[in-house]
């Protein structure tokens, strides 16, 4: 029997890439690959790339330079290391990657991960393999399912892709070009995925997509289901106690989703709703197709559905042409909404996007100053949100052992890390925790009760 081949995947960027990395592991497991955390031991290294942030391509080529050294060292010991570039940089640059970095054996776009075994074999025979087309077949229908042991090893929380691609064409964003048009998976396939996860110990599922609330998958009644209707079906699955979704677009929030937040205890009251700017002028230049007031009204609709809902968001400072007045409008929006957390970034041009050709680039020093000012406000809001938990009892889903002996770590409904001293038998359970103090962004406390119910019992009762 041949010894297993070792696989190392380095993922950059979004939650979708984390999910994609797991599916690549699943696709390669039948070929005898097992994961390793040590890149130097790997027979195959995959860089699972992201094209959203600044200098994404340069980071990939820098990493490939380091891998060339590791590959040469492996060859000196009589071992062949294959190198693959996957993800959105692979989709955007294709053959250019092989031209600039001959060390690369395989370049594969996000829609073709199910073909990885064949691409690796092709590279073994012919030296290189490239696949960045958008194939007709649904990759989700042909990717192997993870083995039960693999599911259990990944913990009690899992991602499930329900939607991929984007039709919004924001002027700063490459996603429509690298992930393609919006595609929604059938309801039945998603239900089967989540059932399989629940049967193997998963208690929390995050539904992911580039524009997840645009979900419109075919249901068993042959009608297109909304995200809200899908969530209702998934909440019925025994064992699933928490459901989340990310990332959303304000224009696709509908009554079905709001009603699900109103009615379903399993749907967590924490919504990531990017807005990018508080200036109507900049929002128009970004092609967001909504105004700041439109966004405020969406927030109000969520809060009417459930007073418990809190929000996070994404912001870009220094978009071409952004003035001090535009930036002040962003600060005003943040101050008015009050976020539990948010991500802020300096604008960086993505080749091939309309914004990359816009004039009036904001000076780097101005962007730095605005980013610092915005992040200070966001940090203040996040700190206030976390401090409000002190003295309260909150529900925590416990996930794993902590760094300290006897410490168990879980997360609240708002994704705040929570630490208690307790036996590891509480992992997989939702328990009340009395919060005593904070340590940076984590809540510290004690179990509020010695009695508990496992997460699957809570899911079944709707608690």
Curated annotation (Swiss-Prot):
The keyword Metal-binding applies. One of its GO terms (molecular function) is N6-isopentenyladenosine methylthiotransferase activity. [4Fe-4S] cluster 2 binds at residues 166, 170, 173. The keyword Metal-binding applies. HAMAP family: tRNA_metthiotr_MiaB. PANTHER family: CDK5 REGULATORY SUBUNIT-ASSOCIATED PROTEIN 1 (PTHR43020), MITOCHONDRIAL TRNA METHYLTHIOTRANSFERASE CDK5RAP1 (PTHR43020:SF2). [4Fe-4S] cluster 1 binds at residues 14, 50, 88. Keywords: 4Fe-4S, Cytoplasm, Iron, Iron-sulfur, Metal-binding, S-adenosyl-L-methionine, Transferase, tRNA processing. Its cofactor is [4Fe-4S] cluster. It catalyses: N(6)-dimethylallyladenosine(37) in tRNA + (sulfur carrier)-SH + AH2 + 2 S-adenosyl-L-methionine = 2-methylsulfanyl-N(6)-dimethylallyladenosine(37) in tRNA + (sulfur carrier)-H + 5'-deoxyadenosine + L-methionine + A + S-adenosyl-L-homocysteine + 2 H(+). It is found in: Cytoplasm. This is tRNA-2-methylthio-N(6)-dimethylallyladenosine synthase. Monomer. Residues 152-384 form the Radical SAM core domain. CDD domains: Radical_SAM. It comes from Rhodopseudomonas palustris (strain ATCC BAA-98 / CGA009). Residues 5-125 form the MTTase N-terminal domain. One of its GO terms (cellular component) is cytosol. It is an enzyme of class 2 (transferase). Its EC number is 2.8.4.3.
């Amino acid at each position: 029997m041949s010894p297993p081949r070792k696989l190392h995947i380095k993922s950059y960027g979004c939650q979708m890439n984390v999910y994609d990395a797991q599916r690549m592991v699943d696709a390669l497991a039948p070929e005898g690959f097992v994961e390793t955390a040590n890149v130097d031991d790997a027979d195959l290294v995959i860089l699972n790339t992201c094209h959203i942030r600044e200098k994404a391509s340069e980071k990939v080529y820098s990493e490939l330079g380091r891998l060339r050294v590791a590959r040469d060292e492996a060859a000196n010991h009589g071992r062949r290391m294959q190198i693959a570039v996957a993800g959105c940089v692979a989709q955007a640059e294709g053959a250019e990657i092989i031209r600039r970095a001959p060390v690369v054996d395989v370049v594969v776009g996000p829609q073709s991960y199910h073909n990885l075994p064949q691409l690796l074999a092709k590279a073994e025979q012919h030296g290189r393999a490239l696949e960045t087309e958008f194939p007709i077949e649904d990759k989700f229908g042909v990717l192997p399912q993870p083995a039960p042991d693999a599911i259990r090893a990944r913990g009690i929380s899992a991602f499930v892709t329900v939607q991929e691609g984007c039709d919004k064409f924001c002027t700063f964003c490459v996603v429509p070009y690298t992930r393609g048009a919006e595609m929604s998976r059938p309801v039945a396939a998603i239900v089967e995925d989540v059932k399989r996860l629940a049967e193997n110990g998963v208690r929390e599922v995050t539904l992911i997509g580039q524009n997840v609330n645009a979900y419109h998958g075919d249901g068993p009644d042959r009608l297109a289901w909304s995200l809200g209707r899908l969530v209702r079906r998934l909440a019925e699955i025994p064992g699933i106690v928490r459901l989340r979704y990310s990332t959303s677009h304000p224009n696709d929030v509908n009554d079905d989703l709001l009603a699900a937040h109103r009615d379903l205890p399993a749907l967590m009251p924490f919504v990531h709703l990017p807005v990018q700017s508080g200036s109507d002028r900049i929002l128009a230049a970004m092609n967001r197709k909504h105004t700041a007031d439109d966004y405020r009204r969406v927030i109000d609709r969520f809060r009417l559905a459930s007073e418990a809902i809190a929000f996070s968001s994404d912001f870009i400072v220094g978009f071409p042409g952004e003035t001090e007045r535009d930036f002040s409008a962003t600060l005003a929006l943040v101050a008015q909404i009050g976020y539990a957390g948010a991500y802020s970034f300096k604008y960086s041009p993505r080749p091939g996007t309309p914004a990359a050709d816009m004039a009036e680039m904001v000076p780097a020093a101005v962007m730095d100053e605005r980013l610092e000012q915005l992040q200070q406000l966001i940090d203040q809001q996040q700190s206030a949100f976390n401090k409000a938990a002190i003295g309260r009892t909150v529900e925590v889903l416990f996930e794993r052992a902590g760094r300290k002996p006897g410490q168990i770590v879980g997360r609240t409904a708002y994704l705040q890390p929570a630490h208690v001293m307790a036996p590891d038998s509480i992992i997989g359970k939702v328990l009340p925790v009395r919060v005593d103090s904070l340590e940076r962004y984590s809540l510290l406390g004690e179990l509020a009760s010695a009695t508990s119910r496992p997460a699957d019992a809570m899911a079944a009762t709707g608690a």
